[in-house]
Amino acid sequence: MAKKIKTARAIEANAGIQQKFKKKLLTFSRAFSTEIVKAILLDLADNGLLAQDRSLTNPKNPQDKRTLQEISKMVLAKWSRNPEFFKDHVEQFIAQHLGSWIAKATPQARKIAEWVARSTAADVTASQRQAYVAAGLPLDFMAEKWTVPVVRQRISQKAADELPSIIEWSTNLITKMAVNDVQRLQDVIVSTLADGKNITSMRKLLGVTSGFDADRARRVAIDQTNKIANGILRANDFSLGITEGIWVHVPGRFSSRETHKAMNGKRFDLAKGMFDPAVNRFVSCAELPFCRCVYRPALNFSQLLKTK
């Protein structure tokens, strides 16, 4: 009879961090979109009627509302004279300024990425430590290996070394998601003018057709935190000498990968991952898009404590 493998419990990303991350993503995306729409509309009006500190996207006082009506008439008049030229002008304006918009947005995206990476690293490490103590590993065993301070916790040097690349990866994804919404903004502006509607209608349509909606932000938040969590957990495990795990399939919200269902309960090399025939390569937990799978670390006490 095969000897039963001793394991610690699997660790999942923190739902509270995922929720906060979702809100940060929505706030960032909406602010980015608002700035771009304002810049486009100001350009369409030749900056002649609106001061830079007034809001075209959300006018509050009577003066701004009157100015908006005047600009609406001006923009529609220009559009009616030469729609194709006007459309090309919008496209060229976006192409010319997209780089500067990205440069302006990137520091805020990086700030969010740093927060989610460090918060997730600290949270999963705390849970990981508790799981190992409950499984019977001495607390000082982790204390000797996890020495780098991160948000009131200490993680392994290997995990700390991976944080910069995690932050860079997350920053790029956050920025890219906002940039991908620029095409939607352009399409709404052009189609609204083509239909002869005013800027007030345009603002309403932009709000209704929000590209980065709450559900998409939730999916992105879950996916990114799962990937970050599993990366940190593996790095911490490697520092302890833990090299194998038991795959735990976590069902998706609407569906599950059949190959990952088949992986459930199987032992695998943490460094190598497990072979997934659906993609014809080895994968780690949470590596594929929207995969929520985790693992239970396999514990060989005699081997681990021998290297202590």
Regions found by a protein language model. Give the residues of each.
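N-terminal leader/targeting and assembly helices and adjacent pre-domain segments
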Residues: M1-F212, L299-K308
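Acidic, glycine-rich two-metal-ion catalytic cores of nucleic acid-processing enzymes
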Residues: G211-K308
